[in-house]
Amino acid sequence: DEGPKSDCKP
């Protein structure tokens, strides 16, 4: 998912 939390996904 795009967004500030996208960097939390592998």
Swiss-Prot record:
Record keywords: Cytolysis, Secreted
Domain of life: Eukaryota
Compartment(s) where it occurs, according to its Swiss-Prot or TrEMBL record: Secreted
Tissues where this protein is expressed: Expressed by the venom gland.
Purpose of the protein: Causes weak hemolysis. Does not cause mast cell degranulation, LDH release and does not have antimicrobial activity. In vivo, causes intense edema formation and intense pain, when injected in mice hind paws. It also induces discomfort and anxiety in mice, as it highly increases rearing behavior (but has no effect on locomotion).
Entry's Gene Ontology BP terms: killing of cells of another organism
Further facts: The primary structure of the mature peptide is identical to that of cryptide To27 from Tityus obscurus (AC P84676).
Protein name: Cryptide TyPep-5
Position of the signal peptide: none
CC terms in the record's Gene Ontology section: extracellular region
